[in-house]
């Protein structure tokens, strides 16, 4: 059973703390022993059971052995590097491709200074940041999909 400690609102010291915004964590269900002995082990065991269950149901097998005499036509990087690979593959000048890669972190560093007047946490009330985020997300997905296609179809995604 959990132990609940009810506040005594007639206490003047407690009322002074509550007026200052303090005391909200003093009451309710205690972390020891309820959370640390009962809830956390259940979550940890549930996570382990989920990982083991997924490993048993769908094991990840190793691929074919590497053959040094049969090189594939195009070697693709890991999935999270597809947009970068696509930029470097499509841009004719490699120095320009590297310069485009440096613009991404520079744009992310400049973004807070562009819209520092608006202090709202709601992203829909911050149109510049929201539009740049959506544009970047769509562009990243477009480049990632294009990297999986042959180079002649990569810019149009094979649609035209």
Curated annotation (Swiss-Prot):
Gene Ontology CC, one term: plasma membrane-derived thylakoid membrane
Alphabetical UniProt keywords: Electron transport, Membrane, Photosynthesis, Thylakoid, Transmembrane, Transmembrane helix, Transport
Example GO biological process: photosynthetic electron transport chain
Keyword Transmembrane helix attributed: yes
Chief location bin: membrane
GO terms for MF: electron transporter, transferring electrons within cytochrome b6/f complex of photosystem II activity; electron transporter, transferring electrons within the cyclic electron transport pathway of photosynthesis activity; ubiquinol-cytochrome-c reductase activity
Localisation per UniProt entry: Cellular thylakoid membrane
Its membrane topology: Multi-pass membrane protein
Transmembrane segments: 36-56, 95-115, 131-151
Record function comment: Component of the cytochrome b6-f complex, which mediates electron transfer between photosystem II (PSII) and photosystem I (PSI), cyclic electron flow around PSI, and state transitions.
Family label: Belongs to the cytochrome b family. PetD subfamily.
Binding partners and assembly: The 4 large subunits of the cytochrome b6-f complex are cytochrome b6, subunit IV (17 kDa polypeptide, PetD), cytochrome f and the Rieske protein, while the 4 small subunits are PetG, PetL, PetM and PetN. The complex functions as a dimer.
This protein's name: Cytochrome b6-f complex subunit 4
Name of the gene this protein is made from: petD
């Amino acid at each position: 059973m959990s132990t609940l400690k009810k506040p005594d609102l007639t206490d003047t010291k407690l009322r002074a703390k509550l007026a200052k915004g303090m005391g909200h964590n003093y009451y309710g269900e205690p972390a020891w022993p309820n959370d640390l002995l009962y809830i956390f082990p259940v979550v940890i065991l549930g996570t382990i059971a989920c990982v083991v269950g997924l490993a048993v149901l769908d094991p990840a097998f190793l691929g074919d052995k590497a053959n040094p005499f049969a090189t594939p036509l195009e070697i693709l990087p890991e999935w999270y590097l597809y947009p970068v690979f696509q930029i470097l593959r499509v841009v004719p000048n490699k120095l320009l491709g590297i310069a485009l890669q440096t613009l991404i972190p520079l744009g992310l560093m400049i973004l807070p200074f562009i819209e520092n007047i608006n202090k709202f946490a709601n992203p829909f009330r911050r149109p510049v940041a929201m539009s740049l985020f959506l544009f970047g997300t769509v562009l990243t997905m477009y480049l990632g999909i294009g990297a999986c296609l042959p180079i002649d179809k990569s810019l149009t995604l094979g649609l035209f």
